[in-house]
Structures are given as C-alpha cells and as structure tokens.
Amino acid sequence: MTNQLIYKGKAKDIYSTKDENVIRTVYKDQATMLNGARKETIDGKGALNNQISSLIFEKLNKAGVVTHYIEQISKNEQLNKKVDIIPLEVVLRNVTAGSFSKRFGVEEGRVLETPIVEFYYKNDDLNDPFINDEHVKFLGIVNDEEIAYLKGETRRINELLKGWFAQIGLNLIDFKLEFGFDQEGTIILADEFSPDNCRLWDKNGNHMDKDVFRRDLGNLTDVYQVVLEKLIAL
C-alpha cells in the first residue's frame, strides 16, 4: 500500500511508496536521549538532519560506497532503497569521548592510535547492549565474513568522512552507522549520517553535534545549521 507508515522511530518515520523497493523517510523535529527517556521537540531539527545526511550520503555514493540513499525530495524527506536492517549499531571511535570514556575510565579527547570499531545490539528492551563478535555470531545476526565486511567498510567510510570534515575545520570524534541487506542480499549502508549519530568538535573543542542537547550546551539547531553551511561550502 502506498504511503503506509512502515516504521515509527524516535527521529524518523518511514512510509511505503508506489515502488515496493523504495521507502520515503521523514525526519522529525524531535531530539531524544537515554533511549528515548528524555524527549524534546526542536523546530527545524528534522530538516537540518535530512539535509546534512543527504549531502553526506551523496558524497559517499560518489566515492563508491554503496548506500540506500536515492534522493532528497523535500527539506525533511528523502527516498531510500528498502533494506532489511541488520540489528547492529556499528560504532567507530577516533577519539575517546562519551560512553567510551565512562566505560574505561579515560579522559575525553585522547586520540586513538588505531580507530576502534564496536558493535551494539539494536534492542530497545535491552537498551542496545555493547556486544562482541562472538555475541554477534551467537545471536545469528551476521556471520564471520559479514562481520569482517562491516568492520572494513566502516573503517573505509571513516577515512572518507574524516577527510571531508577536516576540510571544513571539524574533527570527527566518533560515529554510529547502520547497515542492511538490499533486495539482492548485499550489505549496504543505511539509516542516516548527521550530528545526531556522530560527534564533531571544532578546532576549539566546541561540540558541534547532539551533545549540545545531551549536555545542555546551547541551541541545537544553531549548531546544526553551522554544520550544514560548512558542508554546503565543501
């Protein structure tokens, strides 16, 4: 059925289209933290996330990364290939921050010699627990070969993103990716890439991401607008 709500998320809603292999993603003016325990409506946030993610995915597509992104169709909407999402959050860390610093008792801002890739099991009831490769296989999420691909592709994407953000004066601290299987069974990059799911610090160490909301550091949309304008100028 066309225009039927398929999935209602914290930051995005997904609808069917006339093409069974294409979905319409609508970005919402909502910010959440602690797995939705804190929720707030922020006017304009959805449009900013959509535009930032669209720009990033367009660049990734051109760089040869296979993604679900098709096109942006309005300020807060885009068309994507329909995928079966892999229930993993793939996190890459270039610099210590956030939960990593808390978990291991290290200060924020320490540059990691080699970027660290982590897996989190996408399960709201379990609060998305941190898991390792053996857990991933035990749960039957993906196999050894697919685990290796997810890690390798995430590292490749990191090198591209780090370079682009460095050109606009931003340091890519860490980020979360999601992948899915397309209609041919190929793993492709899905979800979004915006300051909602990455950490960006400017040259002065100022947060240019969702930590502005998490830590009450200022106006979130003002910060996201700056990121968008920098990316447009790239």
Swiss-Prot record:
EC number(s) reported in the record: 6.3.2.6
Any Gene Ontology biological process: cobalamin biosynthetic process
EC top class named in words: ligase
Alphabetized GO MF terms: ATP binding; phosphoribosylaminoimidazolesuccinocarboxamide synthase activity
Classification via InterPro entries: SAICAR_synt/ADE2_N (IPR028923), SAICAR_synt_PurC (IPR033934), SAICAR_synth (IPR001636), SAICAR_synthetase (IPR050089), SAICAR_synthetase_CS (IPR018236)
Catalytic activity: 5-amino-1-(5-phospho-D-ribosyl)imidazole-4-carboxylate + L-aspartate + ATP = (2S)-2-[5-amino-1-(5-phospho-beta-D-ribosyl)imidazole-4-carboxamido]succinate + ADP + phosphate + 2 H(+)
Pfam family, one: SAICAR_synt
Pathway linked to the protein: Purine metabolism; IMP biosynthesis via de novo pathway; 5-amino-1-(5-phospho-D-ribosyl)imidazole-4-carboxamide from 5-amino-1-(5-phospho-D-ribosyl)imidazole-4-carboxylate: step 1/2
Keyword tags: ATP-binding, Ligase, Nucleotide-binding, Purine biosynthesis
PANTHER family per record: MULTIFUNCTIONAL PROTEIN ADE2 (PTHR43599), SI:DKEY-6E2.2 (PTHR43599:SF3)
HAMAP family attached to this UniProt entry: SAICAR_synth
Family membership: Belongs to the SAICAR synthetase family.
Protein name according to UniProt: Phosphoribosylaminoimidazole-succinocarboxamide synthase
Phylogenetic classification of the source organism: Bacteria, Bacillati, Bacillota, Bacilli, Lactobacillales
Gene: purC
